[in-house]
């Protein structure tokens, strides 16, 4: 069966790409250049897609700096640094991009329907939905209803299904799953800062580094500063 995979090039999305392959899917990945601070991730997405040997990798371009509203799309908003995991989960962080997953899933839905795909894979997980409203199980359920009601395939009784295999997993479990699937961690990118070397102090870097450390594993990526 055909599947569209939302691929940022990060740890989570790379894992779901390899999961989709393990599920026997014919994989088509889609990434987004929305002029994010961390556009470096797009290079990783390309490398991961190429290494996985997928059918097609697409990059959609649009500019969310037009209205900002996030530290990832507005340079005037500072990125949080050196926060604890507990501090990260207290409220919705400034790295939340307004309606981003709704935008991404809408593009993925259009792509999936155009190629008659049966599935759309997204890498939302338990750690994400503690802080991000568009990563929660009830959000995914609501978007599944949109997929059913708003497409020709859905109206004909063959809805495109959203698959979120990481929805109940934390970062450590995702890394363990990725190891089983053979995800090339050295090609992935999680850092929110721009640049060629991961900072090691933004929320995303710290979550990733802490998970590898908890498992007693070494993250193959170099960092400017470790945990």
Curated annotation (Swiss-Prot):
Gene3D superfamilies for this protein: HUPs (3.40.50.620)
Cofactor(s) for this UniProt protein: Zn(2+)
Residues holding Zn(2+): 191, 199, 202, 205
CDD domains: QueC-like
Binding locations of ATP: 7-17
GO molecular-function term, one example from the UniProt record: zinc ion binding
Pathway connected to this protein: Purine metabolism; 7-cyano-7-deazaguanine biosynthesis
Protein keywords: ATP-binding, Ligase, Metal-binding, Nucleotide-binding, Queuosine biosynthesis, Zinc
The protein's enzyme class: ligase
E.C. number: 6.3.4.20
Keyword field contains Chaperone: no
InterPro entries found in the cross-reference section: QueC (IPR018317), Rossmann-like_a/b/a_fold (IPR014729)
Co-factor: note: Binds 1 zinc ion per subunit.
Record field: catalytic activity: 7-carboxy-7-deazaguanine + NH4(+) + ATP = 7-cyano-7-deazaguanine + ADP + phosphate + H2O + H(+)
Superkingdom of this protein's organism: Bacteria
Gene Ontology BP annotations: queuosine biosynthetic process
Described function: Catalyzes the ATP-dependent conversion of 7-carboxy-7-deazaguanine (CDG) to 7-cyano-7-deazaguanine (preQ(0)).
PANTHER family (alphabetical): 7-CYANO-7-DEAZAGUANINE SYNTHASE
Family indicated by similarity: Belongs to the QueC family.
Protein name per the record: 7-cyano-7-deazaguanine synthase
UniProt organism field: Trichormus variabilis (strain ATCC 29413 / PCC 7937)
